[in-house]
Amino acid sequence: MLTQLKTYPKLLKHYEEIKEVHMRDWFFKDKERASRYFLQFESLSLDYSKNRLNDTTLKLLFELANDCSLKEKIEAMFKGEKINTTEKRAVLHTALRSLNDTEILLDNMEVLKSIRSVLKRMRAFSDSVRSGKRLGYTNQVITDIVNIGIGGSDLGALMVCTALKRYAHPRLKMHFVSNVDGTQILDVLEKLNPASTLFIVASKTFSTQETLTNALTARKWFVERSGDEKHIAKHFVAVSTNKEAVQQFGIDEHNMFEFWDFVGGRYSLWSAIGLSIMIYLGKKNFNALLKGAYLMDEHFRNAPFESNLPVLMGLIGVWYINFFQSKSHLIAPYDQYLRHFPKFIQQLDMESNGKRISKKGEIIPYDTCPVVWGDMGINAQHAFFQLLHQGTHLIPIDFIASLDKKPNAKGHHEILFSNVLAQAQAFMKGKSYEEALGELLFKGLDKDEAKDLAHHRVFFGNRPSNILLLEKISPSNIGALVALYEHKVFVQGVIWDINSFDQWGVELGKELAVPILQELEGHKSNAYFDSSTKHLIELYKNYNQ
């Protein structure tokens, strides 16, 4: 456990020594701080100079990583050891994008051979849709693709397709359906022509309640309009491992794309779950996405900790969570194309590390994953940055931006990028009472009024942030960015001694929903309901009589 590691008390002592130091003093004394705390990898760079740390902090954090045998645990993941201990599974999302030819054997399965076989089928299918060779039941080309999934079968593909919209096939429109409330699927179907629509049903077991409910609604809509169930074969494909259930649905087994237990849902966009990405962006861009992630994998696996982006970001996060007692972490992308990135990272981070039981089954006596949240930065400035600047919470921030200007939008990117730099500087530097008072007096305010108002215009500063810069929003850079966060999450899981690759926390609510649903549908259940739940069931039934 973290608190039992030999470096932990050293970090506690060091924290007490520097907790009151203001970052602006470090910048004033060290003119090289910005260049020393800056890393470049391919087309992605990290400025971590605006963090409450110094050389001693980093030295101790790297010692902490060594205490946990982080290097050995990284290797164990890449080699296919069963590090998902509660489910006795390997964790090989990295193999999905590997350009290495050294085969990985897992329970007599040739992992890379299996992955590349599915990728080959995905490329052929994608080409047939994009080229117009694959036609609908009236011989129309496909114009709309509907991805039906939830969680990891939705968020990754949604995020990537949105981020890389500029690379999409001009004929194709992407739609994503995850919510089971009925509104989302009906709103999407309302816009579509069944004769030119392709549905991708993404569910590993082909039994996920929300996904199957939406898929059956789409199937009913399609059959009613096409007039014949046999047309399903041309318009529905599945990403699943349950061949029997897929065939019962009416989908041809040749239109089923497989993935495996060694790929967790939140790590699955690189697999057949990414079929919608490949069709929308094309195999060349999908390959570039995989390559960007692979290069980050190699960097994570081989770079020294001192220059290793995922290791640094993971350790800096631990520094705030376990020493500064930070409870929350903000993701602030300054790019419209990255608008779904915060909620993708929410799942990646919180479903992986939102746990309080160690690998040995013991209750952990320290904080683990923070609440991860965010929005597009420029909008967030006019919404909740007030709390970040002058509130009572210490909330580290990841600013994410690109250097590349948008065509035909003169002046826009300069305004956007200036705000990234200004906000990061403001969070670090702040504004003292004396500075605020001087500004007000210079504007001509009465001295007594200025003295009173100045208190409200003080920014303490010393609020930490990372600035992640991409040269441009491209397939390879998005691949690298996602892999960076995947590995950051892994690093923190190792430090906290938790299994980052199970998700038992999603199970209990699903189990309890079964008897409640029986009651709502008019059937008697033998389950026990607390008085609140029982009252609300009756309220629903009475309203809908």
UniProtKB/Swiss-Prot annotation:
Reaction catalyzed: alpha-D-glucose 6-phosphate = beta-D-fructose 6-phosphate
Enzyme class: isomerase
EC id: 5.3.1.9
Keywords: Cytoplasm, Gluconeogenesis, Glycolysis, Isomerase
An individual GO BP term: glucose 6-phosphate metabolic process
Compartment(s) of residence: Cytoplasm
Gene3D superfamilies reported in the protein's UniProt record: 1.10.1390.10, Glucose-6-phosphate isomerase like protein, domain 1
Associated pathway: Carbohydrate biosynthesis; gluconeogenesis; Carbohydrate degradation; glycolysis; D-glyceraldehyde 3-phosphate and glycerone phosphate from D-glucose: step 2/4
Signal peptide start and end residues: none
Predominant subcellular localization, coarse grouping: cytoplasm
CDD domains xref list: SIS_PGI_1, SIS_PGI_2
NCBIfam families, A to Z: PRK00179.1
UniProt record similarity statement: Belongs to the GPI family.
Protein name as it appears in the record: Glucose-6-phosphate isomerase
Source organism (scientific name): Helicobacter pylori (strain ATCC 700392 / 26695)
Encoding gene per record: pgi
